[in-house]
């Protein structure tokens, strides 16, 4: 329990204590982050690394008008279990598409995560895609945070390259189709 009397998540690692919610006013950083995001378009993908401070997800889900897609990657099964005991997801999931990916659960490795994300990211929504790594997660789960960030970056780059390739070759493919159509009739 923090100074304000609210339940918070704190984790000890390497003899250091990490507060995932903050000692004071745990709602304030999430509220400010949500304001900075502004209005989100319909189906905007929002990637969140970690649910140790569920207030970011809560702020996003409760204060976004359009239906968006929220992809949450949690590197700790224990933190995810605590999260499930703390919040009521039903109203958030009625309003938005929320995908939880928890490292350590069966079938939830990074390769399968990549396949899932590939189905969500499109060239059209790349410009409005948002990312958040919950504060202190980069210290607690450094390697996972780097892997998550690289994966998202690589998938975005791949989508841009694929789009540019389609644009470049679409004219050539149309010309080839028309030029070779006469052979199809033979």
Specify the residue positions occupied by each region the protein language model found.
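N-terminal donor/sugar-recognition subdomains of glycan-related enzymes
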Residues: 1-186
């Amino acid at each position: 329990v923090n100074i304000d009397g609210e339940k918070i998540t704190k984790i000890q690692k390497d003899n250091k204590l990490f507060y995932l919610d903050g000692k004071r006013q745990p709602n304030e950083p999430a509220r400010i982050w949500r304001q900075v995001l502004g209005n989100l378009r319909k189906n905007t993908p929002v990637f969140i690394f970690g649910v140790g401070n569920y207030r970011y997800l809560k702020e996003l889900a409760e204060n976004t008008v359009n239906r968006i897609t929220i992809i949450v990657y949690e590197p700790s099964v224990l933190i995810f279990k605590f999260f499930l005991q703390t919040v009521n997801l039903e109203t958030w999931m009625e309003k938005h598409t929320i995908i939880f990916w928890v490292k350590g659960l069966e079938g939830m490795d990074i390769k399968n995560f990549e396949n899932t994300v590939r189905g969500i990211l499109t060239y059209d929504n790349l410009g409005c895609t948002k990312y958040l790594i919950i504060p202190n997660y980069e210290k607690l789960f450094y390697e996972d945070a780097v892997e998550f960030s690289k994966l998202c970056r690589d998938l975005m780059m791949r989508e841009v390259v694929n789009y540019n390739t389609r644009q470049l070759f679409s004219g050539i493919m149309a010309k080839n189709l028309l030029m070779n159509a006469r052979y199809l009739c033979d």
